[in-house]
Amino acid sequence: MNTPTHTHPHPFGSTATIRCERAAAELRTGRPVLLIDAHARRHAVMALDSMTAQSFATFANAVGNTHYLFLTPVRSNVLGLEAPQGARIPLATLSYDSLAKLAYLRQPTRPTAWAPGDIMDAAATEITRLALLLPAIVAAPLTQHTEHAFADCQTLDLADLDTAAACASTTEYELVTRTPVPLRDLGMSEFIVFRGGIAQRDQVAILIGRPDLSSAVPVRVHSSCLTGDLFGSLKCDCGDQLRHSLATLKALGGGVLLYLDQEGRGNGIAAKIRAYGYQHVGLDTIDADAQLGFGPDERRYTGAVMMLRALGITRIQLLSNNPAKAERLRAAGIIVKQRISVIGQITKQNEHYLRTKVSRAGHDLDIDALIMTSQRPQDPSETVDGETVKPIAKTGHA
């Protein structure tokens, strides 16, 4: 008598999300990843950000010098290339030292040989985003003669990226823990930690006061800014916005501040500090990011939406100067009844940054009017490096 057999998935089997996370971890540690498309084409890819001269030479030798550098459409435009799908630059005759110049250098030499990117390159760039690496890829198509060198590398089907993205937008975030925390000038608050999304990062919701969940809840969706929030950088107004938002939530009778792990508009702290270097020589915040291959704003708000839903919040008053943020939350199903502007201090160091956010990112802020109506502080503690900081109205309505 034959015993029927049943195929059961392994209880600790892999999923599309797990495979994407593993691929991101491999790139971040300087290892190649093998990408496979629907036609069974195979590409080996590495992130330039985590490569060394030695690993570059090893990769080039393994693929028989068929490797190329892929640059995003944004960086390609910086190079003067009309490449809406990004650009592949052949590397057979180029040295490792020349890669950084093509990928990051301001005003580099325009490459003469290049080809449009394709779906493989877009997928590889998405993995670098998950890994918080700069979006410059060294890649090569593989053949039966070259693929053996990558036999032990993480393999990722391009369909996994689509599946993982779909899961991230539908899978609820886990509430890990919550506890009361007394805050200076704000009284008792509650810190609520969520975990979810690709990479399972922890995100924090801070409950101020006792908001009425039956009406539109005041909410600030705040992206982390180490330099501004913690160290008081004068290059941005993030720290002011954070503190003024918390004060506004208290004044409105209570609300929620979502503190998201999205340093540098989603690009990561390393990319942000690199971009600061370009700002130091005169580029604005958007052009500085473009030098590195990033678009104006790489943030995604899936996590914020999931956290709000977990808290039972679907209608909000959004504390933000950014109309695009409100629209993206609306597109995800959150009802934004009102947008309340959040205004910080204008300094000599951040005025250009704020004007760029208005002129190029569409933020709703009348900087000239705010400067004209502000009162200069009399407290000598408001002087920084001999320069008087100009405080302005802390809240207002758009």
From Swiss-Prot:
Positions of the region Unknown? 1-172
Cofactor binding mode and count: Binds 1 zinc ion per subunit.
One example of the protein's molecular function in GO is:
zinc ion binding
Give the residues the record marks as binding GTP.
220-224, 241, 263-265, 285, 320, 325
Q: Which reaction does it catalyse?
A: GTP + 4 H2O = 2,5-diamino-6-hydroxy-4-(5-phosphoribosylamino)-pyrimidine + formate + 2 phosphate + 3 H(+)
**Superkingdom to which the source organism belongs:** Bacteria
Which residue ranges are recorded for the region named GTP cyclohydrolase II?
A: 173-398
Q: Which SUPFAM superfamilies match?
A: RibA-like
Where are the stretches annotated Disordered?
A: 375-398
Q: Which InterPro entries match?
A: GTP_cyclohydro_II, RibA, RibA-like_sf
Q: In which pathway does it act?
A: Cofactor biosynthesis; riboflavin biosynthesis; 5-amino-6-(D-ribitylamino)uracil from GTP: step 1/4
CDD domains, per the entry: GTP_cyclohydro2
Keywords from UniProt, A to Z, are: GTP-binding, Hydrolase, Metal-binding, Nucleotide-binding, Riboflavin biosynthesis, Zinc
The prosthetic group or cofactor this protein requires is: Zn(2+)
| Enzyme Commission code | 3.5.4.25
* Single GO cellular component term: cytosol
Extract one GO BP annotation from the record. Answer: riboflavin biosynthetic process
Active site, UniProt feature: 297 (proton acceptor), 299 (nucleophile)
Disulfide-bonded cysteine pairs: these are none
Q: Quick one: which residues bind Zn(2+)? A: 225, 236, 238
Question: Which family is this sequence assigned to?
Answer: In the C-terminal section; belongs to the GTP cyclohydrolase II family.
What is the recorded function of this protein according to its Swiss-Prot or TrEMBL entry? Catalyzes the conversion of GTP to 2,5-diamino-6-ribosylamino-4(3H)-pyrimidinone 5'-phosphate (DARP), formate and pyrophosphate.
What is this protein's name?
GTP cyclohydrolase-2
Provide the taxonomic classification.
Answer: Bacteria, Pseudomonadati, Pseudomonadota, Gammaproteobacteria, Lysobacterales
